[in-house]
Amino acid sequence: MAIRHFKKQVQESSDSENSSSDEKSTTARDDNYSSNPMNESELHLSTKANSDSDSGKDGPDSSSSSSSSSSSSSDDEVTLHKPVFLKRKRKDEQNQPEETGENGSLVRAAYLAKALRQKQYTENIVASETSDQSILSQIIAIDDTDNTNPEQEQLQWEQRQQARLKRERQKKLDKQLLIEEQEMQRASQLSKVDDPWLKELDLNDDSNLNSFDLKASSRNRHPVNSKKDISIPARLQKGQLQLASSHTNNDTEDTEYGYIEE
């Protein structure tokens, strides 16, 4: 404990000595300034020079300390490389075949197709614009002066209506005449042998005639009995042909039955 107390006293004594020396230097400086007054600029320059000298003295130490600290920090740091991200292929790209485009033929074909589509699109736009203009011009050219003379317009409409009906009637008539002419030509070209309908009629007529002949022949073979067939009239005799006359004249009259009387 005695040693520590002694050291403290020594330190206190040294501090007191330093303070006394500083006071002496300041008093001496004040005396010098009072004896040799200086300008503010000179004083500023002197203080700046002192500060530069102090920094020059401390410079190597500071640079050495900074270099040592940087070297130690560089040793502690670990170098990290920049990450590289790889793109994953899509499913549709995987399914597609690989393009061998050394000469760029596929790229050129795609470019030409795109240019062709663009050209077609522009042509369609131009065509639509021209069609719109033509439609607009037709709309503008429509005669909308119907209200100027309604009676005359009504009369003209009736005339147009009659003309339309006449044209339709004439068309129907021409069509009917054409059909009739075609039928006549077809009938003239066909013969009875070629026409199945006429052939069928001929067959029916032949069958009817054959049946009639068969009936007549059977009737001739079997004579009709007069007692049974009462409906068949008997043949008249010559004396029965003379009609009773109310006239007493015996002369024959010129009548339609005169040849019978003779």
UniProtKB/Swiss-Prot annotation:
Region (Disordered): 1-106, 141-160, 202-262
Pfam families: MFAP1 (PF06991)
RNA-binding as UniProt keyword: yes
Subcellular localization, as worded in the UniProt entry: Nucleus
One of the GO biological process terms: mRNA processing
Acidic residues: bias regions: 251-262
Function: Component of the spliceosome and rRNA processing machinery. In association with the spliceosomal U4/U6.U5 tri-snRNP particle, required for splicing of pre-mRNA.
Similarity comment: family membership: Belongs to the SPP381 family.
Protein name: Pre-mRNA-splicing factor SPP381
Native species: Kluyveromyces lactis (strain ATCC 8585 / CBS 2359 / DSM 70799 / NBRC 1267 / NRRL Y-1140 / WM37) (Yeast)
